[in-house]
């Protein structure tokens, strides 16, 4: 009898060592809540494996406790991996730039990540978990939800977790010439200028479409003449590359009705900057004469006929380079020279008034003063043909007034810049000089954050950041454009600007009695919205944005 009692008391299996998830239940519940709200790029299988690691029975209690300590850094890394925050590669690659931020700006950035509503919701969830766990085995529900999420993943692509990610009906896009259809590399159909988007949005199909896009873009370029006609009229080209300005920013600042926008002759309403960082944006603009390339290829040598300003130099245009800053942060000036092909000397910045200080404490010069200096310098040029690249950043996040650490109000800075540019346009009109001005923002400033990124964060080139306002204005025309701007609302990018420049190279637009504006603006190259940084790619596919991080699976961009 004694022997029988002893045998039944001895453990026959490991069942008694299934201790549940304990406090890790709350960890997973928080994730489920964030996933439901659309704030996570959740990885079901990795989380299920992590839960299995936590649940695996371990007889020795000391080893069980040790497992929890080991799980802490793993859980933190997995949580970070499940968010949309920049990965280690991105942080390491930009570590030197972050080190250049002022302390006040770093504090400002950190405070933007604090969402008091979310903190309140998590607190309520904590209290609910503590209360319900007295009677309910929460671990059972957590494991069931994890299994369910993994079953959903097995049923289709990873983004099937969101209803918005379901395949839509076939959408056909049209290019600048709707009647033109060609085949891209690999036999993929291309309608007009853009690869057709007919396949369901699976990761494999989106990767294939992106490859077809780059293959098709590699074949496109603007055709510049070998020389100008004898009766060509000289004029000046001024390209203003403004940092941190998108349609979303203008709307958030309440400046959509600013008179500046009504003073352009041509306005691109659907222009993709293709990136959300300054260096790559400038390179893409300076290489506008060829189709869009991948982010990696931006830092590889390009064909000589890709460089817009070099093409103009070959036709007798004098190059000018000027900046509203010193160009040192992030090696911007170096990138412009090495990868953008702008080797001309930087226009003199001596005694320019400093109106702002950048997030790194560097000077930001007054745009009116810089533009007036350009007027003076180019007026003294012996060559009446010139092409100027002007990069300026008065709207950059973190800019502040001298003596004040707080970031200056975006709306006030944007209002000032728009007013100054409008006044400059008036002065140009009065001068009688023949000038083509092209205003092309680098990217938006992310004035409004979204579910993936807080305000000011641009690691992922979202549509609200890369959809930028581009305007073209001609001065000194015999027959200037009348009425509202001509709106180009087809998907466009830098190649359209290059082609537009080619169409007016002979300068006759300035002397003609009647300008055929429809002919000038019709059939410009269209470019599918593809935006890329070193660690993220965002595409528009079947009228929905999709994002891929660090070469992983495609998921719908949270709306």
Model region roles, listed by residue range:
Residues 299-306, 407-417, 460-466, 478-501, ...:
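A short beta-strand-to-alpha-helix junction
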Residues 11-14, 434, 440-480:
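Histidine-centered active-site microenvironments of extracellular/periplasmic hydrolases
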Residues 330, 374-419, 423, 446-457:
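Active-site His/acidic residue clusters
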Residues 1-181:
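Transmembrane and membrane-interface helices of multi-pass
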Residues 315-316, 424-434:
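A structural motif corresponding to the C-terminal end of an alpha-helix
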Residues 505, 509-559:
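Phosphate/adenylate-binding glycine loop and adjacent helical scaffold
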Residues 156-401, 467, 494, 499-519:
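Active-site-proximal alpha/beta segments of enzymes that process anionic O-linked groups
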Residues 236, 261-264, 390, 422, ...:
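Proline/Glycine/Serine-rich low-complexity intrinsically disordered segments
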């Amino acid at each position: 009898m004694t022997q029988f009692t002893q045998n039944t008391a001895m453990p026959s299996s490991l069942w008694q060592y299934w201790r549940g998830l304990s406090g890790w239940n709350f960890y997973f519940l928080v994730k489920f809540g964030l996933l439901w709200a659309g704030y996570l790029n959740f990885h079901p299988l990795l989380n299920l494996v992590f839960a299995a690691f936590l649940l695996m029975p371990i007889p020795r209690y000391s080893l069980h406790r040790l497992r929890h300590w080991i799980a802490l850094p793993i859980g933190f890394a997995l949580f970070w991996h499940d968010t949309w925050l920049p990965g280690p590669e991105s942080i390491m690659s930009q570590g030197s730039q972050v080190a250049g931020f002022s302390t006040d700006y770093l504090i400002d950035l950190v405070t933007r990540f604090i969402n008091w509503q979310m903190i309140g919701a998590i607190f309520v969830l904590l209290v609910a978990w503590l209360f319900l766990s007295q009677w309910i085995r929460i671990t059972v529900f957590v494991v069931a939800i994890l299994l369910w999420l993994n079953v959903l993943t097995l049923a289709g692509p990873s983004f099937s977790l969101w209803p918005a990610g379901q395949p839509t009906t076939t959408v056909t896009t049209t290019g600048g010439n709707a009647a033109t259809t060609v085949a891209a590399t690999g036999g993929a159909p291309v309608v007009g200028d853009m690869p057709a988007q007919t396949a369901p949005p699976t990761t494999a199909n989106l990767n294939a479409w992106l490859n077809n896009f780059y293959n098709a873009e590699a074949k496109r370029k603007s055709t510049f003449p070998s020389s100008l006609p004898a009766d060509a009229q000289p004029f000046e080209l001024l390209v203003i590359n403004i940092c941190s300005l998108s349609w979303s920013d203008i709307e958030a600042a309440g400046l959509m009705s600013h008179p500046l926008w009504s003073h352009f002759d041509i306005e691109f309403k659907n222009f993709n900057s293709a990136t959300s960082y300054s260096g790559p944006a400038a390179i893409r603009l300076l290489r506008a004469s060829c189709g869009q390339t991948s982010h990696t290829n931006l830092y590889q040598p390009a064909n000589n006929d890709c460089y817009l300003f070099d093409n103009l130099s070959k036709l007798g245009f004098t190059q000018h380079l000027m900046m509203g800053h010193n160009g040192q942060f992030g090696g911007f000036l170096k990138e412009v020279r090495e990868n953008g092909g702008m080797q001309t000397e930087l226009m003199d910045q001596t005694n320019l008034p400093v109106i702002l200080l950048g997030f790194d404490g560097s000077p930001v010069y007054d745009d009116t003063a810089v533009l007036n200096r350009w007027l003076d310098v180019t007026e003294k040029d012996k060559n009446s043909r010139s092409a100027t690249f002007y990069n300026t950043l008065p709207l950059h996040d973190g800019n502040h007034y001298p003596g004040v650490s707080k970031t200056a109000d975006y709306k006030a800075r944007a209002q000032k810049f728009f007013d100054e540019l409008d006044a400059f346009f008036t002065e140009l009109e009065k001068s009688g000089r023949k000038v083509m001005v092209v205003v092309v923002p680098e990217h938006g400033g992310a004035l409004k954050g979204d579910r993936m990124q807080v305000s000011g964060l641009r690691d992922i080139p979202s549509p609200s950041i890369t959809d930028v306002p581009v305007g073209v204005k001609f001065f000194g025309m015999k027959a200037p454009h009348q009425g509202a701007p001509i709106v180009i609302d087809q998907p466009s990018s830098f190649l359209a600007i290059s082609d537009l420049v080619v169409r007016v190279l002979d300068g006759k637009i300035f002397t003609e009695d009647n300008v055929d504006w429809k002919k000038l603006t019709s059939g410009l190259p269209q470019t599918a919205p593809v935006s890329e940084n070193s660690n993220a790619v965002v595409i528009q596919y079947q009228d929905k944005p999709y994002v891929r991080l660090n070469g992983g699976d495609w998921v719908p961009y949270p709306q």
